[in-house]
Design a protein with these regions (language model features):
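Transmembrane beta-barrel architecture of outer-membrane proteins
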Residues: 1, 24-28, 70-75, 111-113, ...
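Predominantly transmembrane beta-strands of Gram-negative outer membrane beta-barrel pores used
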Residues: 30-33, 135
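Surface-exposed loop and membrane-interface regions of Gram-negative outer-membrane beta-barrel proteins
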Residues: 4-28, 35-84, 97-106, 238, ...
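Transmembrane beta-barrel domains of outer membrane proteins
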Residues: 32-34, 79-81, 117-121, 177-181, ...
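Short loop/turn motifs that connect adjacent beta-strands in outer-membrane beta-barrel proteins
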Residues: 37-43, 85, 121-135, 181-191, ...
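Transmembrane beta-strands of outer-membrane beta-barrel pores
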Residues: 2-10, 39, 47-53, 94-96, ...
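Surface-exposed coil loops of outer-membrane beta-barrel proteins
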Residues: 53-76, 80-178, 201-242, 318-333
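Outer-membrane beta-barrel pore domains
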Residues: 12-19, 62-65, 206-395
Length: 395
């Protein structure tokens, strides 16, 4: 199965002070490979385009003169499902709570590790509960392979204790989702989850020149053109490798209301309302909260279908880790933003969709506004307007 996107984005728009424009074309191409090894065991793999040092996108710019663009392993996992209720995955997997909402994680981020899910379904009851899902994920970010951290080690610059062994960075993500079905038209989902990061400063370290050499390039076997993209969090020094937040222990609550919708002119218009809030309980500092509210009307299933989406999101500089959260709501930063996002879709054909996306982005705080608080994009930067048009197809 193939799918892809052709994009024509303009960013960061036309700020009223600098009048900087960046208009360019992009494409993405993904090849999915799926097979059932046994009735209870299956394999999934995906090859995708995109810059190797940017995990937040599979888009490839029209550039490089005439050089060929690369194709990389984006996904590869084994799925074991001994019963209808249990699902176990291992490999390069999607985040266990991935929901394409542009909140917790970017749609293109994949993790090396393991997922577990248990779904308990219910018969019709007074509480309208249809099922409850218990989910957990354990992800491995790095393998420093450093027996003793010395004073000159990049790990020391990331806050690791000199004289100790270099440990891997990890994410442990677990939570529960409850599904309700009120009638044939109305349903909802609510729940919560917790993200516990271990040695999170290594993620920021990988976005520095010496960090990418230690933590990223040995695993790939190639030299990258630069550090990993996606910075945006507050750090203790300008461009430093230590987050201002001493820990990332993130709790999230989510609620989604679904309405099967209405018909007009032979087209269906389902309605979805999504609300999410998150707080980093690993710090008592300012800017540790994030939220998202989204309303979607319509869905593309055939030629002539239309859909409208509005998203409002705020992400504090100490709330989520910028290197793994969505990069479309923010230009040049994944957090420390307040963004209004509008999307209009039109079904050109059954599997071909024209999308028009518009982003209005403001930064929240500036460097030096709090002690040991330095961000790559400060609040004095003019409002950014970004228009992006793309054709999405799958076959």
């Amino acid at each position: 199965r193939f799918d892809g996107i052709f994009r024509s984005p303009t960013e960061p728009g036309d700020p009223p002070v600098t009048h900087v424009q960046n208009a360019r074309a992009r494409y993405r191409f993904r090849l999915n490979l799926d097979t059932d090894l046994y009735p209870t065991l299956s394999f999934h793999g995906q090859l995708a385009t995109g810059p190797v040092n940017n995990a937040l996108t599979s888009d490839q710019d029209f550039g490089g003169i005439t050089a060929k663009h690369p194709f990389f392993i984006s996904e590869a996992w084994i799925d074991y499902h001994p019963t209808k209720e249990v699902q176990l995955q291992g490999g390069r997997v999607q985040a266990i709570f991935a929901d394409n909402s542009r909140f917790l994680f970017d749609d293109d981020v994949r993790f090396n590790g393991f997922n577990e899910k248990y779904v308990k379904s219910f018969k019709k009851n007074d509480g309208y509960f249809s099922s409850v899902e218990f989910r957990a994920g354990q992800y491995i970010f790095s393998n420093p392979n450093v027996a003793i951290i010395t004073p000159g080690s990049p790990l020391a610059r990331a806050g690791e204790v000199v004289g100790t062994t270099g440990r891997s960075a990890n994410l442990f993500h677990q939570g529960v989702l409850v599904n309700q079905s009120f009638n044939e038209k109305w349903s909802d989902q609510f729940g919560g989850d917790v993200q516990l990061y271990r040695h999170p400063n290594q993620i920021q370290l990988a976005s520095t020149a010496d960090g990418v050499v230690l933590l990223v390039q040995p695993g790939l076997g190639i030299t990258l053109s630069g550090p990993l993209a996606g910075t945006g969090n507050a750090t203790t020094t300008p461009g430093g490798a230590i987050y201002t937040a001493p820990a990332f222990q993130i709790g999230r609550l989510t609620y989604k209301l679904n309405y099967s919708g209405f018909q007009k002119g032979g087209h269906n218009f389902p309605v979805t309302l999504n609300l999410q809030v998150a707080r980093n309980f690993g710090t008592g500092l300012n800017e540790r909260d994030a939220m998202l509210a989204a309303l979607q009307i319509g869905k593309i299933t055939k030629r002539g279908d239309t859909s409208f989406l509005y998203v409002f999101s705020i992400k504090g500089a100490n709330a989520l880790i910028s290197q793994v959260t969505d990069d479309d709501l923010g230009t040049g930063t994944g957090v420390n933003i307040r963004t209004n996002h509008f999307r209009f879709e039109y079904g050109i054909a059954k599997k071909v969709t024209l999308q028009s996306l518009f982003f209005i982005q403001n930064s929240l705080r500036s460097s030096g506004q709090y002690p040991n608080f330095f961000v790559p994009v400060s609040a004095f930067v003019p409002t950014s307007y970004r228009l992006q048009q793309q054709i999405v197809f799958s076959f």
